[in-house]
């Protein structure tokens, strides 16, 4: 039987017998988030309201170029959504935040409001995020000792979160010219079998005038956008490869535990807040080590340290298989130096803004 990269269908998953993970179901979703709503809700300043009404604070980068005294709200000042000015925080609704219209559209269904997009394939990785975060908060801190006694086996909850975070780096349109993300995309594109180029054919038929805003806002050329989006479809499709190329890529990153170090930093309610940026990650690199920082919630972030030699080598072999995930993590509570460094890196590597639970810059940049 001819191999299919995807199946376009209006039926439910249970009604479609073969290749359920290659199935794309038509849906009316037009607002496509490149940082998932479930991730953003971990920073909601009004978590007591229904999910569709939850907000986060958007802090433009200009806020952090002002003296501390100028950043502090004056008595009586109010922070409201829709009233953002230069250097001022704004409360923004998560439903429309860090999203773009038709960003991940493969094709439209004629004479209907529906389209085929990455919604269901992303949902596989986004589901269970809140529960995974809650589980990480229950883990016991690793008291620094010697050898392996200061680490614990990576729980499934952390693997789930890290998988979504690495996908977030790749699906974020701000990152298509970022060297780290670009090289990952190139590695995947080089391993796409011929069947995966069916995505290129379909996406390239889209009317350029309908994606003009995407090209302008994220500095894509038309062909650059087509290649980037087709790469996302190709790496996630289990019709192209099973396990998917993305799953193989992710698992291979951690295939040699001795070459990877994972750290989880957590903070109690009175120990300060963590930011997340519109770039989805922050990075530090040296000739010997690459450190990738990802926000998890308002009170947690993780850092994955990769030996540079290993990082350069695995991109040539990841497509062979998806090795079993194994590794250890060090859990550290209340480290203010690391929190401030993470927040500063997040700010310095953001594109337009950072986001969090508080409108005050000092809550992210001062030790508690």
Language model segments and positions:
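Alpha-helical structural context detector biased toward long hydrophobic helices
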Residues: 2-368
């Amino acid at each position: 039987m001819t191999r299919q990269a995807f199946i376009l269908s209006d039926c439910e998953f249970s009604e479609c017998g073969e290749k359920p993970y290659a199935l794309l179901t038509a849906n009316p979703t037009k607002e496509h988030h490149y940082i998932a709503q479930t991730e953003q809700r971990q920073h909601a300043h009004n978590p007591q309201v229904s999910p569709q009404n939850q907000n986060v604070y958007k802090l433009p980068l200009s806020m952090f170029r002002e003296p501390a005294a100028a950043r502090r709200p004056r008595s009586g000042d109010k922070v409201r959504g829709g009233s953002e000015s230069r250097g001022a925080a704004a409360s923004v609704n998560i439903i429309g935040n860090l999203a773009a219209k038709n960003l991940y559209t493969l094709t439209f269904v004629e004479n209907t409001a529906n389209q085929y997009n990455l919604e269901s394939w992303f949902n596989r990785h986004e589901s269970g995020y809140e529960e995974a975060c809650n589980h990480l908060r229950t883990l016991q801190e690793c008291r620094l000792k010697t050898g392996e006694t200061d680490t614990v086996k990576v729980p499934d909850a952390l693997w789930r979160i890290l998988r979504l975070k690495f996908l977030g780096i790749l699906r974020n349109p701000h990152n298509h010219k970022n060297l780290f993300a670009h090289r990952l995309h190139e590695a995947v594109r080089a391993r796409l079998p011929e069947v995966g180029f069916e995505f290129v054919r379909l996406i390239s038929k889209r009317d350029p005038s309908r994606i003009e805003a995407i090209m302008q806002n994220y500095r894509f050329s038309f062909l650059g956008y087509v290649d980037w989006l087709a790469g996302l479809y190709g790496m996630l499709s289990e019709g192209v490869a099973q396990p998917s190329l993305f799953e193989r890529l992710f698992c291979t990153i951690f295939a040699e535990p001795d070459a990877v170090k994972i750290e989880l930093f957590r903070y109690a309610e009175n120990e300060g807040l963590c930011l997340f940026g519109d770039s989805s990650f922050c990075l530090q690199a040296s000739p010997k080590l690459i450190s990738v920082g990802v926000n998890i919630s308002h009170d947690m972030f993780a850092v994955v340290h990769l030996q540079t030699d290993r990082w350069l080598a695995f991109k040539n072999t990841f497509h062979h298989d998806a090795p079993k995930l194994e590794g250890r993590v060090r859990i550290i509570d209340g480290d203010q130096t690391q929190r401030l460094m993470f927040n500063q890196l997040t700010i310095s590597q953001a594109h337009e803004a950072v986001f969090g639970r508080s409108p005050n810059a000092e809550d992210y940049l001062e030790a508690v």
